Amino acid sequence: MAAYVIGRAAAEHPNKPALLVFSDPYRPPSEVWSFAAIEDAVLRIAAALEAEGLEPGARVMIRLENTSTYALLFFGAIAAGYVPLPTSSQLTESEAEFLLRDSGAQLLAISEGLPLANIPAGVRVVDGARVPAMAASPARATYADTAADDPAYLIYTSGTTSRPKGVLHAHRAAWGRRPMYQGWYGITPADRVLHTGAFNWTYTLGTGLTDPWANGATAIVYTGPKDPSIWPGLIRSAEATIFAAVPTLYRQILRYAEVDRGGSLGALRHGLIAGEAPPPGLFEDWQGRTGRELYEALGMSELSTYISSAPAIPRKPGAVGKPQPGRCVAILPVDGGTTPLPPGEEGLLAAHRSDPGLMLGYWNRPDEEAEVLRGAWFIGGDLARMDENGYVIHCGRANDIMKALGYRVAPQEVEAVLSEHPAVAEVACAEMQVRADVSVIGAFVVPRRGAERDPESIKRFAAERLAAYKCPREVVFLDALPRTANGKLRRGDLKSWRLA
């Protein structure tokens, strides 16, 4: 995987910028790495890791800030034949300890400001400050001789609905990302890709790092404070041509930053969105204000994105997009069976298990792994339907469906209506337990600045636009919706909400 992502570009254009690191959105980059420099650092880190005496395939847990060091160590471990485990710097000590123990990592790279006291005996600890010295060590490794199905990296799911579980990917995962190149990004070697997320997320590791490098393009990393208003300035300073973020950030940029159809976004060609359902009107508002298109994708840690719109796949209102060229996708019955449903019928979105981008499996979770496999298909839990032209309409997550008066209600349907209320800035819905035996639909609302917090107004608005059983019975006002470090909604937190 490391040879495919880095080695080819280093051989073809060694002096071309591979990575630009910005600490200030309005100043030149603080670090500029060529492909040759990236490869040299990665292979020297690989040699330093080999000197630690790790077993083949050993897990290497990364607990560092989102810097170039993180990216170099991730690929250095892969180049040596080890299995990096990227983690968020925002994890609590207990959360990080769980990942360390559950993964059985043999080496932990950790920054001084990210404490972790209960480290199991036998785990080697590398101070994060030492990694740059490893990148300059005298020894230089060669790429490990790995097979396509050998483990390459281990990602833990964000845990929005349950305890995190490890998703183990093979070296072929990098090859399995090829349908995204033109099926979502429309990427060329001339592009500069700016992703706003952290490296522990597959969206960032793939879209923001792996795929640009595999295409000989330039990746951009920002390490400064992430106020929504700074992104247009950084896009201009970095001369970014592709921008990737969660939908919420695009909405915040429109609200808090100065953007227009002129030069406010510099050379930007288009934006990419994934990670959560976009709020109603986002595509139209962004295009109207900036003159640029947004292209959406649907995916998951187990497969990454596999359904999308793109410069080559026109966006259809209400649909995520189409299965990327080369993907085998179907809609299967919710209650079992492997025969795909006809166009227009809602069911479980499934990807064929022959897809090279599909995970090897869940780390030490055979029972949970069995639940997502059905014959030749992998089922990730997304409800969807496919129209006669192959466009996929996402209908929510199967485990997010709310039950009200015997009916099944998708939270996204209610959210789409409530988001049109003039006092609503953001909204999320979930089934709330009000008594031991009674659950109702709850709406969690972040009000617009200066708006009155009037729950009855929200309820009346819903009653005029939704069937009675779909209307929220409780409205809870929040200063902010609960989100993961990468901006994804933590709907599980809302499900566990209890009224005072």
Show where each model-derived region lies.
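Conserved ATP/PPi-binding loop(s) of AMP-dependent carboxylate-activating enzymes
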Residues: 326, 337-371, 409
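Conserved AMP-binding A3 loop
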Residues: 31-36, 152-176
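Conserved beta-loop-beta connector loops within the AMP-binding
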Residues: 330-352, 386-389, 451-455, 490
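Gly/Ser/Thr-rich phosphate-binding loop
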Residues: 240-245, 254-316, 328, 338
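Conserved AMP-binding/adenylate-forming core of the ANL superfamily
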Residues: 19-67, 71-75, 92-97
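AMP-binding/adenylate-forming catalytic core of the ANL superfamily
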Residues: 91, 243, 355, 360-361, ...
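Conserved pre-ATP/AMP-binding loop-to-beta segment of ANL
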Residues: 14-17, 137-156, 162-163, 186-192
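Conserved AMP-binding/adenylation subdomain of ANL enzymes
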Residues: 175-192, 202-242, 256
